[in-house]
A protein has these predicted regions:
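Acidic/histidine-rich alpha-helical segments that form the ligand environment
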Residues: 6-7, 74-130
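Amphipathic, well-ordered alpha-helical segments in soluble domains
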Residues: 10-20, 47, 51, 113-116, ...
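Extreme N-terminal tail/first-helix region
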Residues: 1-13
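Helix N-cap and loop-to-helix transition residues
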Residues: 21-22, 36, 101-105, 143
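A short small-residue
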Residues: 24-28, 90-99, 134-138
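Short, charged, low-complexity loops and linkers
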Residues: 1-4, 32-33, 98
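Short, contiguous alpha-helical
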Residues: 27-80, 122-168
């Protein structure tokens, strides 16, 4: 199964939890995480939107963030080899969730992320063959395949954190 399909499945699992858990999604459990499950999912939805925009730009070969000269990320291959994201990283301000998450907005953003991943998958593009990179502020310059892997791994990471907060 490819990265985009796995991402879609993870986002679907988040949507299912949102339907099942209701108000529990908005409770912070400080012994489990500094964020509520809704905040984890909100952060993930925003970050996924940005990551998939990078994939779309790279596939299209257009975009002001594309860099053909940047050296490839050395950190992303390490994360891929590790198989998961370590805990404890601080979210960039642009994707930091508010204290109170609007559930309708969150549902819309998760659905939009799924749709974006499906649209990219439907192009049939071989992401590993796409040229160019877009720089991630912490991980360095990543190609389209790495951005898709990042989105999937990041989603799985925050799904697991959300589940832990919910005790499920």
């Amino acid at each position: 199964m490819d990265e985009l399909q796995r991402l879609i499945e993870t986002l679907t699992a988040m949507e299912t939890l949102m339907e099942q858990e209701g108000e529990a999604l908005h409770r912070v459990q400080p012994d489990r995480s500094g964020w509520s499950a809704a905040q984890h999912f909100y952060h993930l939805a925003l970050a996924t939107d940005l990551g998939l925009r990078n994939v779309r730009s790279l596939v299209a070969g257009k975009g002001r963030l594309i860099d053909h000269e940047a050296p490839p990320s050395t950190r992303m291959p390490e994360l891929i080899a590790l198989g998961h994201f370590p805990e404890g990283a601080e979210a960039p301000r642009i994707v930091t969730p508010p204290e109170a998450v609007n559930p309708e907005f969150l549902a819309t953003e998760l659905a939009a992320a799924k749709e974006a991943a499906a649209r990219i998958a439907a192009t049939g593009a071989d992401l590993a063959a796409v040229e160019g990179r877009v720089v991630h502020q912490d991980l360095g310059a990543m190609d389209a395949a790495q951005w898709a892997t990042f989105a999937r791994m990041h989603a799985e990471h925050h799904l697991a954190l959300g589940q832990r907060v919910l005790g499920s």
